[in-house]
């Protein structure tokens, strides 16, 4: 009889554990769905703003004095939107981005900037895995720096990204003083929220723009 009671208790415990596991799995799926919903809402807001800005550029294209440069800048914006979507979906999948791949993204921006009339060269000193958030902030920083340099006609523009002790540093040296440059509130808030900063600094006896971020899952080199 005692054995039967023990077996009955064990059966109830196993059933309870199975229910707890099932409940935990349901909660996990709900949390994942909620997190993905929040991410997609964030992407939707972000893309809506970028597409709206892009639509304004396209609308004003016939009135511009240099339509070729304007068309090149629109292509630059489209490239940025495409790559940001790529980074977003990598983040949803919990994947990292190799520094070499980020280097390809940055080379694309530099090439399109040159078509827009801005002589640009960007060196990516990262080759190992990077956290998606850090990679996204570096990519957005490069895009906004190029956009500001185009408006200021600050050619040439030299940029280099490297890992230092405990931090990522992304420097840009433009052809004119960037002290009055203003980055978007979205970018500055995201950088600050990640424990980083964007600031003007003396670079090679000239004033440059520097983004610093704390190192996360990145590897040096």
Give the predicted meaning of each segment.
Residues 1-36:
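Conserved signal-transmission helix
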Residues 28, 32-38, 117-144, 166:
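Conserved short strand/loop->alpha-helix "switch" segment adjacent to the catalytic nucleotide/phosphoryl-transfer site
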Residues 43-124:
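Conserved DHp (HisKA) dimerization/phosphotransfer helix of two-component histidine kinases, i.e.
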Residues 50-57, 61, 131-160, 190:
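Conserved ATP-binding N-box helix of the HATPase_c
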Residues 156-171:
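Short beta-strand/loop element within the Bergerat-fold HATPase_c
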Residues 171-178, 215:
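Glycine-rich acidic phosphate-binding loop
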Residues 178-210:
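ATP phosphate-binding glycine-rich loop and adjacent ATP-lid/helix-beta elements
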Residues 216-221:
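C-terminal end segment of the histidine kinase catalytic
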């Amino acid at each position: 009889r005692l054995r039967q009671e023990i077996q009955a208790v064990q059966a109830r415990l196993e059933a309870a554990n199975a229910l707890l596991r099932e409940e935990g799995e349901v909660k996990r799926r709900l949390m994942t769905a909620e997190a993905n919903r929040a991410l997609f809402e964030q992407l939707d807001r972000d893309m809506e703003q970028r597409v709206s800005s892009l639509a304004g550029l396209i609308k004003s294209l016939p009135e511009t004095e240099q339509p070729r440069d304007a068309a090149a800048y629109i292509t630059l914006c489209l490239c940025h939107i495409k790559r940001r979507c790529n980074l977003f979906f990598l983040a949803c999948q919990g994947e990292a981005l190799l520094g070499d791949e980020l280097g390809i993204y940055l080379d694309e921006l530099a090439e399109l900037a040159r078509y827009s009339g801005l002589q640009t060269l960007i060196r990516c000193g990262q080759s190992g895995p990077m956290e998606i958030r850090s990679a996204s902030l570096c990519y957005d920083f490069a895009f906004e720096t190029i956009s500001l340099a185009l408006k200021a006609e600050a050619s040439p523009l030299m940029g280099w990204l490297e890992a230092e002790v405990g931090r990522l540093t992304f420097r840009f040296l433009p052809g004119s003083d960037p002290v009055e440059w203003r980055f978007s509130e979205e970018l500055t808030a995201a950088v600050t929220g990640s424990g980083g900063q964007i600031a003007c600094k003396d670079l090679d006896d000239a004033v440059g723009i520097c983004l610093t971020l704390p190192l996360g899952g990145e590897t040096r080199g």
